């Protein structure tokens, strides 16, 4: 009940207060959400012409950046990004019934539910670790984070991927039958592959599984992640990896990756210092306890996924997107904090006794 209340307050607050902050788009309808909205509208029976007009008119009055859109530019045979977005079908499919009922506002339902899944998942992690009160506090703090709510409630796929990642962590912790766990985690990876490019994240988790002596599941899940990534990679080999460096050629791009990673680290940390100091403190705390307790499962997963999402942001090539591509780190951050604080509480209790 408490989680739902704080989620509702966060969602209603976001509906009421959204716009530009320091020139950054904290609105609900983002530029790449145009394509997801267009696809959902065509799925419910609108022609491309009608869908383009609906999106164009809506963005003109409800978006804050790049809100002047030529309706024909959104058509499947016109927009240059459809090759990249073609495989990102899960969000439009799930949103289609809500778009049918509520129009363009229906595109906000899945992101809102994704936020609820994230918050309940953190509570579930805390219950499993017998640290439910701190888990509740973390979920509440996350619902108040301006950066997290910026992306989780917007009409983009990052919130959905974060929700799936949260379910992955919960399933990993609660399902002990290895075959059932393999099936469940594999299904989540497949669904995640249809949100946006997430293969680096999944492979990092598979490395963690391997280190936890779950070698069979690690290898099989890694194969699943690669198999469902390959079709997207083949369609977007030039534009999917450091798209801003297309002129340098594919062979030269690895050399650019290090520079891109340095830029991502500088801008992401700088933006969080300005916009969300509490979030960056939680991340640094999780990093510190993970390094200190490196033998723990949660520590390994947090550090591996942190590196993977850092690389993902660098590969994308868009600098200064304010933690957007690192959003799936949140459930692992909670996992690390909750496990480490539980251990410290137990140690202090034994000392007193």
Regions found by a protein language model. Give the residues of each.
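Specific aromatic-rich, kink-prone transmembrane helix
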Residues: 121, 160-177, 184-188, 332-336
């Amino acid at each position: 009940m408490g989680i739902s209340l704080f989620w509702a307050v966060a969602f209603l607050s976001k509906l009421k207060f959204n716009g530009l902050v320091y020139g950054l788009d904290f609105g609900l309808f983002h530029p790449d959400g145009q394509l997801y909205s267009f696809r959902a509208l065509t799925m419910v029976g609108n022609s491309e012409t009608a869908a383009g007009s609906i999106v164009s008119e809506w963005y003109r009055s409800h978006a804050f950046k790049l809100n002047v859109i030529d309706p024909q530019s959104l058509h499947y045979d016109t927009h240059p990004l459809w090759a990249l977005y073609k495989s990102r079908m899960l969000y439009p499919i799930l949103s289609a019934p809500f778009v049918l009922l509520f129009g363009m506002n229906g595109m906000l339902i899945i992101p809102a539910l994704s936020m609820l899944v994230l918050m309940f998942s953190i509570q579930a992690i805390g219950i499993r670790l017998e640290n439910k009160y701190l888990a509740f506090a973390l979920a509440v703090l996350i619902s108040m984070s301006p950066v997290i709510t910026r992306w989780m409630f917007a009409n983009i796929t990052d919130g959905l991927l974060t929700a799936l990642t949260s379910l992955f962590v919960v399933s990993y912790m609660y399902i002990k039958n290895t075959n059932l766990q393999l099936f469940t985690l594999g299904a989540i990876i497949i669904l995640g592959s249809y949100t946006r490019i997430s293969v680096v994240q999944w492979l990092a988790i598979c490395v963690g599984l391997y280190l936890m002596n779950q070698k069979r599941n690690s290898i099989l899940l890694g194969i699943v992640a690669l198999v469902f990534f390959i079709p997207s990679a083949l369609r977007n080999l030039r534009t999917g990896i450091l798209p801003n460096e297309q002129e340098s050629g594919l062979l030269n791009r690895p050399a650019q990756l290090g520079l891109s990673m340095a830029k991502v680290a500088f801008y992401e940390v700088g933006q969080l210092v300005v916009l969300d100091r509490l979030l960056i403190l939680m991340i640094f705390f999780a990093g510190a306890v993970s390094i200190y307790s490196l033998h723990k499962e949660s520590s390994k997963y947090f550090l591996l996924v942190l590196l993977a999402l850092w690389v993902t942001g660098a590969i994308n090539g868009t600098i200064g997107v304010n933690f957007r591509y690192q959003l799936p780190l949140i459930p692992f951050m909670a996992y690390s904090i909750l496990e480490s604080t539980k251990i410290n509480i137990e140690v202090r209790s034994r000392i007193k006794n």
